[in-house]
Swiss-Prot record:
This is UPF0246 protein Ssed_1188. One of its GO terms (biological process) is response to hydroperoxide. Belongs to the UPF0246 family. It comes from Shewanella sediminis (strain HAW-EB3). InterPro entries: YaaA (IPR005583).
Length: 257
Protein backbone atom coordinates (compact mmCIF):
# COMPACT_ATOMS: atom_id res chain seq x y z
CA UNK A 1 0.00 0.00 0.00
CA UNK A 2 1.44 3.33 -1.08
CA UNK A 3 -0.05 6.44 0.51
CA UNK A 4 0.10 9.89 -1.12
CA UNK A 5 -0.30 13.13 0.83
CA UNK A 6 0.06 16.84 0.16
CA UNK A 7 2.79 19.00 1.68
CA UNK A 8 1.99 21.94 3.98
CA UNK A 9 2.57 25.68 3.76
CA UNK A 10 3.71 25.83 7.38
CA UNK A 11 7.27 24.66 7.95
CA UNK A 12 9.25 23.90 11.11
CA UNK A 13 13.01 24.31 10.89
CA UNK A 14 13.41 25.29 14.55
CA UNK A 15 12.84 21.96 16.29
CA UNK A 16 14.91 18.84 15.79
CA UNK A 17 13.56 15.97 13.71
CA UNK A 18 12.41 12.82 15.45
CA UNK A 19 15.26 10.83 13.91
CA UNK A 20 18.76 11.49 12.61
CA UNK A 21 18.23 9.10 9.71
CA UNK A 22 17.83 10.80 6.38
CA UNK A 23 17.86 10.26 2.64
CA UNK A 24 18.30 12.63 -0.29
CA UNK A 25 15.45 13.68 -2.61
CA UNK A 26 15.55 11.80 -5.90
CA UNK A 27 14.37 14.53 -8.28
CA UNK A 28 16.80 17.30 -7.37
CA UNK A 29 17.81 17.90 -10.98
CA UNK A 30 14.21 18.92 -11.68
CA UNK A 31 14.05 21.03 -8.52
CA UNK A 32 17.15 22.87 -9.65
CA UNK A 33 15.46 23.83 -12.93
CA UNK A 34 12.50 25.27 -11.01
CA UNK A 35 14.78 27.15 -8.63
CA UNK A 36 16.47 28.79 -11.63
CA UNK A 37 13.06 30.03 -12.80
CA UNK A 38 12.11 31.22 -9.31
CA UNK A 39 15.35 33.17 -8.95
CA UNK A 40 14.31 35.31 -11.90
CA UNK A 41 11.33 36.60 -9.93
CA UNK A 42 11.44 39.80 -7.89
CA UNK A 43 9.70 39.70 -4.50
CA UNK A 44 6.82 41.68 -6.02
CA UNK A 45 6.48 39.03 -8.74
CA UNK A 46 6.40 36.30 -6.11
CA UNK A 47 3.74 38.17 -4.12
CA UNK A 48 1.55 38.41 -7.21
CA UNK A 49 2.18 34.88 -8.48
CA UNK A 50 1.67 33.14 -5.13
CA UNK A 51 -0.92 35.59 -3.77
CA UNK A 52 1.07 36.16 -0.58
CA UNK A 53 2.07 39.19 1.50
CA UNK A 54 5.21 41.21 0.77
CA UNK A 55 6.80 39.73 3.89
CA UNK A 56 6.22 36.13 2.80
CA UNK A 57 7.30 37.00 -0.75
CA UNK A 58 10.57 38.42 0.57
CA UNK A 59 11.17 35.34 2.71
CA UNK A 60 10.68 33.03 -0.25
CA UNK A 61 12.84 35.14 -2.56
CA UNK A 62 15.61 34.69 0.03
CA UNK A 63 14.92 30.95 0.18
CA UNK A 64 15.21 30.62 -3.58
CA UNK A 65 18.49 32.55 -3.51
CA UNK A 66 20.03 30.43 -0.75
CA UNK A 67 18.80 27.07 -2.09
CA UNK A 68 21.72 24.74 -2.79
CA UNK A 69 21.99 21.45 -4.63
CA UNK A 70 24.08 20.21 -1.70
CA UNK A 71 21.75 18.94 1.03
CA UNK A 72 22.83 18.43 4.62
CA UNK A 73 21.26 18.54 8.07
CA UNK A 74 22.69 22.06 8.33
CA UNK A 75 20.55 23.51 5.53
CA UNK A 76 17.72 20.97 5.31
CA UNK A 77 15.41 18.77 7.37
CA UNK A 78 13.58 15.51 6.78
CA UNK A 79 10.31 16.30 4.99
CA UNK A 80 8.10 14.38 7.42
CA UNK A 81 9.31 16.57 10.28
CA UNK A 82 9.65 19.84 8.37
CA UNK A 83 6.01 20.08 7.31
CA UNK A 84 3.45 21.37 9.77
CA UNK A 85 -0.26 21.87 9.15
CA UNK A 86 -3.56 20.07 9.59
CA UNK A 87 -2.58 16.81 7.86
CA UNK A 88 0.67 16.66 9.81
CA UNK A 89 -1.09 17.48 13.08
CA UNK A 90 -3.27 14.44 12.48
CA UNK A 91 -0.25 12.32 11.59
CA UNK A 92 1.81 13.51 14.60
CA UNK A 93 5.18 12.35 13.24
CA UNK A 94 7.04 13.31 16.42
CA UNK A 95 5.49 10.36 18.27
CA UNK A 96 5.97 7.70 15.57
CA UNK A 97 7.75 4.52 16.63
CA UNK A 98 10.92 3.49 14.83
CA UNK A 99 8.97 0.71 13.13
CA UNK A 100 6.34 3.17 11.88
CA UNK A 101 9.06 5.54 10.62
CA UNK A 102 10.55 2.67 8.62
CA UNK A 103 7.12 1.81 7.23
CA UNK A 104 6.57 5.45 6.31
CA UNK A 105 9.80 5.55 4.34
CA UNK A 106 8.58 2.62 2.28
CA UNK A 107 4.84 3.27 2.07
CA UNK A 108 4.34 7.06 2.28
CA UNK A 109 5.11 9.70 -0.35
CA UNK A 110 4.65 13.47 -0.15
CA UNK A 111 3.74 15.34 -3.33
CA UNK A 112 5.61 18.63 -3.76
CA UNK A 113 5.60 21.51 -6.22
CA UNK A 114 9.37 21.91 -5.94
CA UNK A 115 10.58 18.40 -5.16
CA UNK A 116 8.02 16.37 -7.10
CA UNK A 117 7.73 13.37 -4.82
CA UNK A 118 9.42 13.09 -1.44
CA UNK A 119 10.05 10.15 0.82
CA UNK A 120 9.44 11.02 4.48
CA UNK A 121 13.13 11.04 5.40
CA UNK A 122 14.29 12.96 2.33
CA UNK A 123 16.10 16.13 3.32
CA UNK A 124 14.23 19.22 2.20
CA UNK A 125 15.40 22.81 2.11
CA UNK A 126 12.65 25.30 3.04
CA UNK A 127 10.50 26.56 0.20
CA UNK A 128 7.03 27.60 -0.83
CA UNK A 129 5.88 26.59 -4.28
CA UNK A 130 2.39 25.17 -4.42
CA UNK A 131 1.55 22.71 -7.18
CA UNK A 132 -1.16 24.99 -8.56
CA UNK A 133 1.27 27.89 -9.07
CA UNK A 134 1.28 29.14 -12.67
CA UNK A 135 5.06 29.39 -12.89
CA UNK A 136 6.32 29.60 -16.47
CA UNK A 137 9.10 27.08 -17.04
CA UNK A 138 11.03 25.24 -19.72
CA UNK A 139 8.18 22.75 -20.20
CA UNK A 140 5.13 24.99 -20.09
CA UNK A 141 3.14 27.55 -18.16
CA UNK A 142 2.51 25.65 -14.93
CA UNK A 143 3.92 22.97 -12.65
CA UNK A 144 1.63 20.23 -13.94
CA UNK A 145 3.21 20.65 -17.37
CA UNK A 146 6.66 20.84 -15.81
CA UNK A 147 6.33 17.55 -13.92
CA UNK A 148 4.53 15.77 -16.76
CA UNK A 149 4.91 12.00 -16.24
CA UNK A 150 7.82 12.29 -13.80
CA UNK A 151 5.80 12.07 -10.58
CA UNK A 152 3.60 9.25 -11.87
CA UNK A 153 6.70 7.30 -12.91
CA UNK A 154 8.14 7.74 -9.40
CA UNK A 155 4.88 6.56 -7.84
CA UNK A 156 4.97 3.45 -10.04
CA UNK A 157 8.58 2.82 -9.05
CA UNK A 158 7.65 3.09 -5.37
CA UNK A 159 4.75 0.70 -5.96
CA UNK A 160 7.06 -1.89 -7.48
CA UNK A 161 9.54 -1.53 -4.61
CA UNK A 162 6.99 -1.88 -1.82
CA UNK A 163 5.32 -4.97 -3.12
CA UNK A 164 1.65 -4.39 -3.96
CA UNK A 165 -0.57 -2.41 -6.31
CA UNK A 166 -2.70 -0.26 -4.02
CA UNK A 167 -2.41 3.55 -4.02
CA UNK A 168 -4.25 5.40 -1.25
CA UNK A 169 -4.82 9.01 -2.25
CA UNK A 170 -4.94 11.21 0.85
CA UNK A 171 -3.73 14.29 -1.04
CA UNK A 172 -5.71 17.38 -2.02
CA UNK A 173 -7.12 17.73 -5.53
CA UNK A 174 -4.52 20.41 -6.30
CA UNK A 175 -1.67 18.02 -5.64
CA UNK A 176 -3.17 14.79 -6.90
CA UNK A 177 -3.68 16.45 -10.30
CA UNK A 178 0.10 16.04 -10.70
CA UNK A 179 -0.48 12.26 -10.80
CA UNK A 180 -1.96 10.53 -13.85
CA UNK A 181 -4.35 7.87 -12.51
CA UNK A 182 -4.72 6.05 -15.83
CA UNK A 183 -0.96 5.50 -15.91
CA UNK A 184 -0.70 4.08 -12.39
CA UNK A 185 0.30 0.43 -12.15
CA UNK A 186 -2.27 -0.27 -9.48
CA UNK A 187 -5.72 0.37 -8.07
CA UNK A 188 -6.58 3.75 -6.59
CA UNK A 189 -8.45 4.31 -3.33
CA UNK A 190 -9.50 7.85 -2.35
CA UNK A 191 -11.04 7.98 1.15
CA UNK A 192 -13.69 10.64 1.84
CA UNK A 193 -14.26 12.11 5.30
CA UNK A 194 -17.58 13.70 6.20
CA UNK A 195 -18.54 15.52 9.38
CA UNK A 196 -22.08 16.18 10.53
CA UNK A 197 -22.94 19.85 10.72
CA UNK A 198 -26.42 21.36 11.04
CA UNK A 199 -27.97 17.97 10.46
CA UNK A 200 -26.03 17.17 7.27
CA UNK A 201 -22.86 15.21 6.58
CA UNK A 202 -20.39 17.16 4.47
CA UNK A 203 -16.67 17.40 3.77
CA UNK A 204 -15.29 20.16 5.99
CA UNK A 205 -11.77 21.01 4.86
CA UNK A 206 -10.20 21.56 8.28
CA UNK A 207 -11.54 18.28 9.68
CA UNK A 208 -10.90 16.33 6.46
CA UNK A 209 -7.23 17.36 6.41
CA UNK A 210 -6.71 16.20 9.98
CA UNK A 211 -8.56 12.97 9.23
CA UNK A 212 -6.22 12.29 6.30
CA UNK A 213 -3.26 12.64 8.63
CA UNK A 214 -4.88 10.37 11.21
CA UNK A 215 -5.51 7.75 8.54
CA UNK A 216 -1.84 7.87 7.51
CA UNK A 217 -0.92 7.31 11.15
CA UNK A 218 -3.41 4.43 11.40
CA UNK A 219 -1.97 2.76 8.28
CA UNK A 220 1.61 3.07 9.54
CA UNK A 221 1.00 1.99 13.13
CA UNK A 222 -1.17 -0.98 12.17
CA UNK A 223 0.66 -2.07 9.01
CA UNK A 224 -2.55 -1.84 6.98
CA UNK A 225 -2.28 -3.53 3.59
CA UNK A 226 -5.85 -4.04 2.36
CA UNK A 227 -9.08 -2.18 1.65
CA UNK A 228 -10.82 -4.06 4.45
CA UNK A 229 -8.08 -2.93 6.81
CA UNK A 230 -8.72 0.68 5.82
CA UNK A 231 -12.41 0.35 6.63
CA UNK A 232 -11.57 -0.37 10.28
CA UNK A 233 -10.23 3.17 10.72
CA UNK A 234 -12.03 4.72 13.70
CA UNK A 235 -9.79 7.52 15.00
CA UNK A 236 -11.38 10.58 16.61
CA UNK A 237 -14.90 9.23 16.24
CA UNK A 238 -14.92 8.48 12.50
CA UNK A 239 -16.63 5.31 11.31
CA UNK A 240 -16.88 3.52 7.98
CA UNK A 241 -20.16 4.07 6.13
CA UNK A 242 -20.56 1.03 3.90
CA UNK A 243 -23.83 2.26 2.37
CA UNK A 244 -22.17 5.32 0.79
CA UNK A 245 -18.83 3.70 -0.04
CA UNK A 246 -17.37 2.12 -3.15
CA UNK A 247 -14.17 0.13 -3.58
CA UNK A 248 -12.56 3.29 -4.97
CA UNK A 249 -13.99 5.80 -2.49
CA UNK A 250 -14.62 4.56 1.06
CA UNK A 251 -16.65 7.06 3.08
CA UNK A 252 -16.00 7.77 6.74
CA UNK A 253 -18.43 9.81 8.82
CA UNK A 254 -18.36 11.52 12.17
CA UNK A 255 -21.02 13.08 14.35
CA UNK A 256 -20.99 16.82 15.04
CA UNK A 257 -18.06 17.96 17.16
Amino acid sequence: MLVLVSPAKTLDYENKAGTIEHTLPKLVQHSEQLIEECRKLAPSDIASLMKVSDKIAGLNAARFTSWSRDFSTDNAKQALYAFRGDVYTGLDADTLSQQSIERAQKHLRILSGLYGLLRPLDLMQPYRLEMGTRLANIKGTNLYQFWGDVITDEVNLALSEQGDQIVVNLASNEYFKAVKPKSLNGSLITPIFKDRKNGQYKVISFFAKRARGMMVRYILDNNIKTFSGLTEFDAAGYYYCEAESTAQAPVFKREEQ
